[in-house]
Amino acid sequence: MYVVLEGIDGVGKSTQIELLKSAFQNALFTKEPGGTKIGETLRHIALHENLSELARAFLFLSDRAEHIESVIKPALKEKKLIISDRSLISGMAYSAFSSLELNLLATQSILPAKIILLWIDKEGLKERLSLKSLDKIENQGVEKLLHIQQKFKTHAYALKEQFGCEVLELNAKENAKNLHERISAFIQCVV
């Protein structure tokens, strides 16, 4: 089963991934972008080189295609539980070019069975961003991140409606232990 954790930077995905590693020790943990050696190179270019938005979008699509082919497909064939930090949903939410058709091509129409969507309100986001050094995306400001967060929700629920992906939406301001318990229960109801 393919499960993804989604949400804007600062909502606690990394914290939850670390907690899930203890709870699901036999799972394959991966990430997008950069879940393969080639993906790491593509991610670095996309994030650090001066590229057009279209070129950047195609680099991320290339990373996604390689990740699906070399990581996700083999693990699904072996009937493994796959837990990914981000997926095509992030790609569509962060990009100005959020083509579902291109993402379906890149993923060979392999979609997550379960989507865990962490969200946060404006005040919570401001508080969390004040506690860390900001990257290029986070430096775009709170309003931009909240707009991107809305795109996450739109894309996650579109996948639910069109393809039957299950969605668990959680307020990231809840305490990490409670979030972990709810996320684990959501994953386990099929495992």
Swiss-Prot record:
Its EC number is 2.7.4.9. ATP binds at residues 7-14. It catalyses: dTMP + ATP = dTDP + ADP. Keywords: ATP-binding, Kinase, Nucleotide biosynthesis, Nucleotide-binding, Transferase. The keyword Kinase applies. One of its GO terms (biological process) is dTTP biosynthetic process. GO terms for molecular function: ATP binding; dTMP kinase activity. It comes from the Bacteria. GO terms for cellular component: cytosol. Belongs to the thymidylate kinase family. Phosphorylation of dTMP to form dTDP in both de novo and salvage pathways of dTTP synthesis. This is Thymidylate kinase. It comes from Helicobacter acinonychis (strain Sheeba). The gene is tmk.
